[in-house]
Every structure is written in structure tokens, then in C-alpha cells.
A protein has these predicted regions:
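Short, intrinsically disordered, charge-balanced linker/junction segments flanking boundaries
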Residues: 214-225
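Active-site-proximal cap/lid insertion segments
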Residues: 1-193, 197-213
Length: 225
């Protein structure tokens, strides 16, 4: 579902742009790429928050079929059986163990990966990559019912690392953020705001109390951190 607000009046969600039975993740990817194209001549901010991967897991049929063929069924203590999903059954009614290789989850992740690639390619094509901060992250760890966060303990809705430790990838070419480097310094999503302010040379509003701190120096020199 896309909830229409004053901020997205321009988005015509009733128009089918990708043919019959368009897939939501693909549509959001398309809208994001089109947004960049429309705003290429001026500063823009794009926040793309995918619904996937989220239960109930439903991947795009052609990708689900791809992953059905790619892996044999495994053993798992995780529920949410994709065989029940394929049969159109209520996931909550499943009482047996699910195979470990869930093609629906894999398919949903591939759709997100494709969208990230499309956005990065569009920025490159328009010559905007060096002047665009591209951040990839997530809101929480994986749900224990459908995946495993091992070797981290716990998962979504838990304060163990499996619930709160998420990916963070920053792409900002032109020597601003070195490619292929990693950093073990713990940061939190609250740090994004002060970090972006510093990156854009904007002074914080003195009336605001910032929960995070700028990590821009860590982005630029991750090895030192």
C-alpha cells in the first residue's frame, strides 16, 4: 500500500506503468529513478523506503521460480513455509517447519538490489554521482521467523545485536568517501542528520537538540576510525 499524503500528491499511484500485475518494489524503484531524472538540474533529497522484505513474503513470480531452481530444500527451525505461500494458504496456519532456502525472501532481496543498481546507474549516467551522497541502510535486523542473524543473537524487536545491527553503506565518489573500505566504529541512524549537515556545510539550528553526532570524518577516513 502507498499512503497518499500532501507530500506525494504528484505520485499517480492509480497509473499502471509496468504492465499487468506490476510488482510494488519494482514500481518504487521506477518512481525513484524517475524522480532523479526530473530533478537532475537542482539539489534534491530522495528517501526510498521499501516495504520489502517484509512478511508476508511474496517475491516476484519469475524471481521466485529462479530461486526455486537454484537451491534444494534444506532443514530449518524457521517457520513461514514458502510451499504454503505458493499454494495461497494462510501463513499463520502453517504448523510445520519451513525449508531454509526461502525463494520468496531471495526474490524480494534481488528486487531491492536491482533498484539500488538502477539508482546508482542513473546517477552515473547523469554525471551526478560525485555530487550525491548515496546511503543504504535498514531499520532493524531480520525477523527470527523467516531468517537467521547468526552469529548475532536475536532479531527484529530485540535489543540484541541481531535486532539492532544493520547494514550501512555510503557511496560518495570523487575522493570524498573512499571505495572498498570498512569501519568497525559503531554508529546509529540518529547520526545521519548531523553528518549530512556537516557534509553540506550547514550549521545546526541552535534551538534544536541533536541526538546524534556527525560521523563525516569517519566516512572520509574509515581506517583511522
Amino acid at each position: 500500500y502507498v499512503f497518499r499524503t500532501q507530500l506525494i500528491r504528484w505520485l499517480d499511484i492509480t497509473e499502471n506503468r509496468m504492465g499487468k500485475n506490476e510488482y510494488l518494489t519494482d514500481r518504487l524503484n521506477l518512481e525513484a529513478v524517475n524522480f532523479v531524472e526530473r530533478n537532475k538540474g537542482k539539489p534534491f533529497f530522495l528517501y526510498l523506503s521499501h516495504y520489502a522484505p517484509h512478511t508476508i513474503l511474496n517475491g516476484r513470480p519469475d524471481l521466485v521460480d529462479k530461486y526455486h531452481k537454484k537451491h534444494p530444500s534444506g532443514k530449518s527451525v524457521r517457520r513461514n513455509c514458502y510451499l504454503c505461500q505458493d499454494a495461497g494458504l494462510d501463513i499463520g496456519a502453517c504448523t510445520h517447519w519451513a525449508p531454509s532456502h526461502n525463494p520468496h525472501l531471495a526474490a524480494m532481496l534481488e528486487s531491492i538490489d536491482d533498484g539500488i543498481g538502477l539508482l546508482a546507474k542513473k546517477l552515473d549516467e547523469l554525471g551526478l554521482a560525485e555530487n550525491t551522497i548515496f546511503i543504504f541502510s535498514s531499520d532493524n535486523g531480520g525477523e527470527n521467523n523467516i531468517t537467521s542473524n547468526a552469529p548475532l543473537r536475536g532479531g527484529k524487536s530485540q535489543l540484541y545485536e541481531g535486532g539492532i545491527r544493520v547494514p550501512l553503506i555510503v557511496r560518495w565518489p570523487g575522493g570524498k568517501v573512499p571505495a572498498g573500505q570498512t569501519c568497525d566504529l559503531p554508529v546509529v541512524n540518529h547520526d545521519f542528520y548531523p553528518t549530512l549537515l556537516e557534509a553540506l556545510a550547514i550549521k545546526p539550528d541552535p534551538s534544536q537538540t541533536l541526538d546524534g553526532v556527525s560521523t563525516l570524518s569517519t566516512w572520509k577516513t574509515p581506517k583511522i576510525a
